[in-house]
C-alpha cells in the first residue's frame, strides 16, 4: 500500500510528521508538501512561475508552491506510474470547520487528490498540542478503510478535538456548520508610516447546533464530514429557470 501525504503548514510541520509516523508500518509513505506555511491557500494553483521541487529526505519532497500544486505534481508527475492508494492531508495545526473549508489549504490538498481519482481525507487538530490523539484517529480510520473501504467516493474532512486521547468520546458523522462574517480588518502602521492591514479574527459560530462539526468538537467528539465538489444549488434550479423565463426571456 502507498499513501501520499501533503498539508498546508509546510513540509517541516509537526502535524505532517505525526501523520507519517502513525502510518509507516502500514504503508509506503511519500510526503510532498509546501516549502513553507501556505495556510489559507485554498485551491489556488501556481501559474506565473515554475514549481521548484527539492528532495529533502527519502520519499520527502519540498515544493515551492501551494498545497494543490503539491498534490497535482505528485499524482501527475512524481507518482504517475504507480498512484497512491490514499491521499491524506494534515494533520493541520488548527481546526477546519464549517465554511472554513472554503479557505483551507489542508482541505484543498485532499480535494485535489479527489479530483484526480484517489480516495482522499483531510485531517485537522482543533489546536496545536495533542497530535498524538489526532494520529490515533488517523490510524484508526485508515485501518478501517483497509478492512472495509470507505463506502463513498466523497472527500472526507476529519477534525479531532485538541484533548488527551482518554477525553475524546469517539467519532461522529457531521455536516458543516457556519460562521458569522469575519471581524473587520485590523489597520496598523508600518515603520515608515504606511497603512497596513491584517485580516481580523474569524467570526463566531452562526450554525453550530447538533449535527454540525462545531457541535461535535465542542463536545469532545471527532467530526467526520463527507464533502462534495459540486457547488450547484440544485434546489434553486427550478426557481431560477422560472425566473429567467418569466422575467428575462419574457
From Swiss-Prot:
For this chain, the family text in UniProt reads: Belongs to the SurE nucleotidase family.
Main site of residence?
cytoplasm
Q: Which GO terms describe its molecular function?
A: 3'-nucleotidase activity; 5'-nucleotidase activity; exopolyphosphatase activity; metal ion binding; nucleotide binding
State the NCBIfam families in the record: PRK00346.1-3, PRK00346.1-4, surE
Cofactor binding mode and count = Binds 1 divalent metal cation per subunit.
* SUPFAM superfamilies xrefs: SurE-like
Record: residues binding a divalent metal cation: 8-9, 39, 92
Location relative to the cell: Cytoplasm
* Catalytic reaction(s) noted: a ribonucleoside 5'-phosphate + H2O = a ribonucleoside + phosphate
The EC number(s) given in the record are 3.1.3.5
- Give the protein's biological function: Nucleotidase that shows phosphatase activity on nucleoside 5'-monophosphates.
Q: What is this protein called?
A: 5'-nucleotidase SurE
Record-level GO cellular component terms: cytoplasm
Alphabetical list of InterPro entries matching this protein: SurE, SurE-like_Pase/nucleotidase, SurE-like_sf
Amino acid at each position: 500500500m502507498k499513501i501520499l501525504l501533503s498539508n498546508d503548514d509546510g513540509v517541516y510541520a509537526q502535524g505532517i510528521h505525526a501523520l507519517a509516523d502513525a502510518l509507516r508500518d502500514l504503508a509506503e509513505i511519500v510526503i510532498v508538501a509546501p516549502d513553507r506555511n501556505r495556510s489559507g491557500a485554498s485551491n489556488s494553483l501556481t501559474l506565473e512561475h515554475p514549481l521548484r521541487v527539492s528532495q529533502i529526505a527519502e520519499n520527502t519532497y519540498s515544493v515551492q508552491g501551494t498545497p494543490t500544486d503539491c498534490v497535482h505534481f505528485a499524482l501527475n508527475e512524481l507518482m504517475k506510474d504507480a498512484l497512491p492508494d490514499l491521499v491524506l492531508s494534515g494533520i493541520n495545526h488548527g481546526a477546519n470547520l464549517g465554511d472554513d473549508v472554503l479557505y483551507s489549504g489542508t482541505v484543498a490538498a485532499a480535494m485535489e487528490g479527489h479530483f484526480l481519482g484517489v480516495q482522499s481525507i483531510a485531517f485537522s487538530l482543533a489546536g496545536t498540542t495533542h497530535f498524538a490523539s489526532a494520529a490515533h484517529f488517523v490510524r484508526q480510520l485508515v485501518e478501517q478503510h483497509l478492512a472495509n473501504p470507505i463506502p463513498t467516493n466523497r472527500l472526507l474532512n476529519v477534525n479531532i478535538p485538541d484533548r488527551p486521547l482518554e477525553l475524546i468520546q469517539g467519532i461522529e458523522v457531521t455536516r458543516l456548520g457556519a460562521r458569522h462574517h469575519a471581524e473587520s480588518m485590523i489597520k496598523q502602521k508600518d515603520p515608515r508610516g504606511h497603512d497596513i492591514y491584517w485580516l481580523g479574527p474569524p467570526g463566531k459560530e452562526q450554525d453550530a447546533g447538533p449535527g454540525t462539526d462545531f457541535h461535535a468538537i465542542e463536545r469532545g467528539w471527532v467530526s467526520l464530514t463527507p464533502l462534495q465538489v459540486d457547488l450547484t444549488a440544485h434546489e434553486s434550479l427550478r426557481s431560477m429557470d422560472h425566473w429567467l423565463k418569466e422575467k428575462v426571456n419574457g
